[in-house]
A protein has these predicted regions:
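Short, flexible, glycine/charge-rich loop motifs used to bind or transfer phosphoryl groups or to couple energy/partner
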Residues: 1-2, 23-24, 111-113, 135-136
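Extreme N-terminal, non-catalytic leader segments
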Residues: 1-9
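Hydrophobic anchor at the beta1->P-loop junction of P-loop NTPases
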Residues: 12
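Walker A (P-loop) phosphate-binding loop of P-loop NTPases
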Residues: 17
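A conserved segment at the C-terminal end of the G1
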Residues: 20-34
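A generic secondary-structure signal for well-formed alpha-helical elements
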Residues: 31-37, 160-163
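PAPS-dependent sulfation machinery
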Residues: 38-124
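PAPS-dependent sulfotransferase catalytic domain
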Residues: 112-182
Length: 182
């Protein structure tokens, strides 16, 4: 069993092209909220568990561990995104200089303790958070969810525009696909 270190998390969720990328930066702009993270491996782990490719307990453990590690790495400046045009880039954050200076911070458990006391809020963008809500409640009870709903006609039009539906041909596929065994 592994308990999460960081319990103040806002999960901005919705289907592809629902508007998460507009809402998450607004959440991140609030005081004491970290810059938004896209941690898509969490979706993959939960989908694998939901499809019974891995067991639920393993999925919960992996997600707790991955989120704690990702949030800690964010706090010490590891894996910083310097791509100017990306929505998770430090150049789109409210505190660009502070985020860049984190690479100079001495790492260690004191960072975790400091941010637990400070009640730092982490913001992450994910797909299918409400569909897989049962899994999320097992990760931590304190997470807050903002589920984005969009007119389905507009959503499907955006999917068509972005090539979603031809997902099998996309190299960086975020959807879990399995071949049928005959």
């Amino acid at each position: 069993y592994k308990e999460c270190f960081f319990k103040n998390v806002v999960v901005v969720t919705g289907t592809y092209c629902s508007g998460k990328s507009m809402v998450a930066p607004i959440v991140s702009s609030l005081s004491n909220v970290e810059h938004v993270r896209k941690l898509l491996v969490v979706d993959q782990i939960f989908h694998l568990a939901n499809l019974r490719k891995i067991n639920k307990e393993s999925a919960i453990f992996l997600v707790r561990h991955y989120l704690d590690k990702s949030f800690y790495e964010q706090l010490i400046g590891r894996n910083i995104n310097f791509r100017v045009e990306d929505e998770t880039s430090i150049f789109t954050a409210k505190n660009t200089e502070e985020l860049a200076n984190r690479i100079l911070i001495k790492r260690g458990e004191h960072i975790i303790t400091k941010h637990i006391k400070k009640k730092t809020i982490f913001c992450m963008d994910t797909h299918d958070g409400i569909m897989l809500y049962d899994y999320w409640t097992k990760v931590s009870k304190g997470y807050k969810f903002i589920n984005i709903y969009r007119n389905p006609i507009d959503t499907v039009a955006s999917w068509e525009k972005h090539g979603i539906g031809k997902i099998e041909k996309v190299r960086f596929n975020e959807v879990v696909l399995f071949k049928n065994k005959k």
